[in-house]
Amino acid sequence: MRILIIAIAAFFFSNQLFAQGCCSGGSGSPIAGGTSQGVLAERQVEIGMSLQSINTDKFMIGDKPTKDYLKNYNSNYLYSRFAYGVTKNFTMSVEAGYFFNKTQTGLGGEKVFDKGISDLIIFPRYDVYTHNTEKTRDEITLGLGLKIPLGKYLDSTVSSVNPFTGAKNYVKMPPVVMPTTGANDFIFYGFAFRGYPEKKFRIFANAIYIRKGWNALGERFGDYASVGLFAGKTFFKNLGITLQLKGEWIDKMDYDKQIGKDGMLAIYNVDVTSFGSKKIAIVPQISYPYKSFSVYILSEFPLYQYVNGTAIASQYLFTLGISYRFFTVKQKG
């Protein structure tokens, strides 16, 4: 049986959940739920769901904290995945998510809020190397995915009301509260695993690169790269403890030069100087399998952050998930 490890890389993308920006930057969903994964066994099915919650009142200029930006940002995201082992080496998954809320609270208590479906993710993975002995299990998996936006990326909110006529003036909501960026993105993924079954110990790593596309507004949010190093051990038969060291990088935003000349960036509520960041974090996780089910919980703790301009910083990230695996045909033996 091929290896499928439920070890959330807290965000494939915590960046995808709130990203960067003055009046906020990128938006979208955590690609593939952040799961560090190999492939399923042939004709094995996995159905997974997780709830990811972000809350922060931490904002930064470069690597220094600031209190003159926003009061709070929070989001709650439901991620779902259906994966199928087409062959012993090839797994196909279809993934999607829904934001219950993406809320930005200003210094005066004013709130900007949105919700809705985010993206559809088609994510095939192929096991390019497997070698098992009595003492070790090795696996290398590569993946190439596509993110297709389904949700809103252009929405507005009331900015003021004329006291005499009652007429309402609207402004575009900042990208950070939009459920998606409105662009097609390509996902490049690598996963390497070594396990020591007798010792119930495992080490593994993943690398992710997301090449962001252009949306209809002439915006291209910054590319994303992440590397995760994991170590895990099983205690008391089924209790899995995993610790991840994660580094991530988000590039600056690009935009069509014509919308810059026309002053549309201000109308779009975007400050391109406040996009992009670097972060190092540790992510502890606890998982517990029971029969065909697995339950897991994790949280992310940033060790170092740097943002371009003035931007939202990572503070609290929490994930609770469950997965169910079964075979479409009865296994021999």
What is the predicted role of each segment?
Residues 45-49, 92-94, 122, 138-144, ...:
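Transmembrane beta-strands of outer-membrane beta-barrel proteins
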Residues 51-57, 96-102, 128, 146-152, ...:
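Transmembrane beta-strands of outer-membrane beta-barrel pores
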Residues 104, 110-206, 212-213, 269, ...:
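Outer-membrane pore/translocation modules
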Residues 21-23, 36-44, 89, 130-139, ...:
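Short loop/turn motifs that connect adjacent beta-strands in outer-membrane beta-barrel proteins
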Residues 58-60, 66-68, 218-333:
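Outer membrane beta-barrel transmembrane domains
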Residues 52-77:
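Surface-exposed strand-loop-strand hairpins of Gram-negative outer-membrane beta-barrel proteins
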Residues 41-43, 74-78, 114-120, 138, ...:
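Residues that define the transmembrane beta-barrel architecture of outer-membrane proteins
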Residues 42-55, 169-263:
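Detector for outer-membrane/organellar transmembrane beta-barrel domains
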